[in-house]
Amino acid sequence: ENTVQIQSSGIQSEAYFTIKESNVGHIFGILRNQLYSNKPLAIIREYCTNAFDAHVDAGIPERPIEVSFPTHFKKSLTIRDFGKGLSENEVFTVFNSYGESTKRGTNDQVGMLGLGSKSAFCYVNDFKIVSHHDGVKSVYLAYIDESNKGKISLLSREATDETGLAIDIVIKSEDLYSFREVASQFLYEFNPQPIVLNDDNVVNNLSKQDQTSYIVRNDKYAVVNDSRKSNTVRMGNVNYDFDISD
């Protein structure tokens, strides 16, 4: 972080920048509606990389995450990991606070800004969080209330032998194609490739032979030269375009 050091002599008065309580809903609205230009991509990218990071944290990076697409009977997109899950305190801390992140102390995971876990709010006003942790399955509803600040409510608890976290987001029928296209493109080079449920189109795209050629590749990052896209640097399953033409 960059800070500015100034001489204190001559200062007559000072005040810290802050956000008034009455303006918090307005600021949250800006973060929800203007942070992401491609909302389907933001949702797929943020929650899939979070799920992968959960596997890294649990010591199972080779295990695929699961991505389940909407059907006639189930209208939601579900992204599921099999990591440690989150306690109630962790759910409330991570999901209800912009800027809160569990990843700032490591270089082994993607993201540290504390924004991605709330990315569903750029598309919907509510989504479910299902945590399997310490023998308990807890279902939470994250939603934007009348204050526009948002809340998280615990809906149910029951015993479970499973671990991990699932994010459940209802997708509008007219947007399903956009989410399929984004998933096909983003998850194409995800490693390990996710288990995709309920959508043969995405499954078929992911099963095509990978045409990727690597300029540099190691266990931390890869520099990719791919006929389908520009040169990219891939870190933690996220590609960042760059130009090496010069």
Pin down the residues of each PLM region:
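Bergerat-fold GHKL ATPase/HATPase_c domain
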Residues: 1-64, 68-71, 89-96
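Glycine-rich G1-box
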Residues: 84-85
